[in-house]
Amino acid sequence: MPDDAAFDTKAFTGIEALLLSVIDSRVRFVTGVAGYPATALMELLLKHQLEGYKAFWMTNEKTALEKALGASVTGQRSMVVVKHVGMNVLSDPLMTSVYHTIGAGVVIIAGDDAGARASQNEQDSRFYGSLAEVALFDPATPRGVYDAVMHAFQLSEQAKVPVVIRITDRLLDSKGHVLRSRQNETTATFDKDIWKLTTKGKHQRFHRESMPLLEKAVQTTSLNWLRPGNSRMGIISSGYISVLVDKALSEPRWKGHAHLSLQMVSPFPFDMVRQFISECDEVLVVEETEPYIESHVAVTGKVKGKMTGHIPYGQVEAEHIGYALDHLGESRIGKYTEVQTIKSRGSRPLCQDCPFMPLYKCLANIDVMVAGDMGCSIRAAPEPLQAIDTGFALGSAISTACGFKDKGIAVIGDFALAHSGIVGLINAVGSVDDVVVVILQNRVAAMTGGQEAPDLMSVVKTLVSDTIVLEMPAYTSDTSNDAEDRLKGLLLSKMDQKGVSVVYLLGKCTKQ
């Protein structure tokens, strides 16, 4: 323990612990892209950037990591803050950075949305540890978050690769004490001798020099801990779920069960897990959101979890753990098979005073395939509007519409256009596709807190000569019918034309 390490008498939330770790690890450069549950963390980091680091909102996760890598190779510790689907976007430079090597430490915070409260999927960022061959931490408590960041920067510089830390909303909201210690300024540098190696040679170097360091770290870290029991039943967990498991095991009927909590899960700690399983007759794996740990150990025949139906896929609650413990005698159960519907969950409709409501009402009455995007427009897909047919990913609307069998319409927000949708528009022009693109410009990322969106109108007009700009008035029942009729006539006329047409709709988000 460092000499200056000390418990802070105040209890911190997970998000506050992350801020403290950024300050104490002497981070100098932070980039982030808005998206639940990462937005609140990035906003806090922006608020406190006078603490010695610079922080920047970025338009897209790939550029966020690339900018951080630029900071790294010039000696600045950097952090990248994204939501889980943002990991998909930054995966290209992440994969190659492992071969390329870095300079000062790079830590990526991946905000997972277990329960899909505000996301298009529930993907589990832990799998990026295996895919990218990087260390990945899954802390359980505010102290675990703080310690993970401090360890991650040191490990990143030793192994010369980025490190990923997975967080969730419940972890960020949880409270606990933090053992603080101040690290020295980094002296890590980027070694240009890497260019003496071929690409294959770089990968060989990684497995000879970097991977052994990561494997040693996961087998020796204090972040992975065992609470022994006096029964032959054991539980393995990771992340915030470890807290729920501990609470369950405080009940008298389950108090004797052993608990192995993994807060560093990549590289997978096979030795520790193998030893734990060998001492148990039965093992329950409790984790969010996919069976990452379970898939590594299911072949032992002792393990139960998501794959056996004992634990639900997605978010895990305390009652799920209790039910699983009560039914360990069953080899497989089918309790968690009911599919959630919008009716059972409750609808999340568009704001009734949205300036773009006339567009959605218009689209609902046009017999044309409409590709939506990961913004407010996706809320027009369910009943009662049913105005949008598809919605795959942020920035996907234009390319999706270009693939329709017959000419279709793409509806995309200005932030999604800047994030990645502009590439789809460039391809549409280059391929001479038949498509009508409706761009909703309110100059903010309305779904993620109102971050400013770049204005690409001049770029779009340069790309597409057939670009029309319309002002959308504040929505009222009096203005709706006129605006709806005007849009319907315009869109139908564009559908009769060949090539790419763009309709820019300018409106002000009433939430901002």
What is each PLM-predicted segment?
Residues V81-V82, V107-G111, V164-T168, I236-S237, ...:
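Short beta-strand segments
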Residues M1-V27, P139-L350, P355-L359, A364-V368, ...:
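Flexible, low-complexity linker and terminal segments
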Residues M1-P142, R170, G229, G256, A381-V502, L506-Q512, ...:
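Thiamine diphosphate
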Residues L41-L44, K67-L69, L90-L94, A116-Q123, ...:
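Short acidic, glycine/serine/threonine-rich loops at helix termini
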Residues L44-E51, D246-H259, K461-S465:
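Short helix-loop-beta junction
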Residues Y36-P37, V85-G86, G111-A114, T141, ...:
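Short, glycine-/Ser/Thr-/acidic-enriched flexible segments
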Residues L50-W57, H100-G111, T189-W195, V432-R443, ...:
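A glycine-rich helix N-cap at a beta->alpha junction
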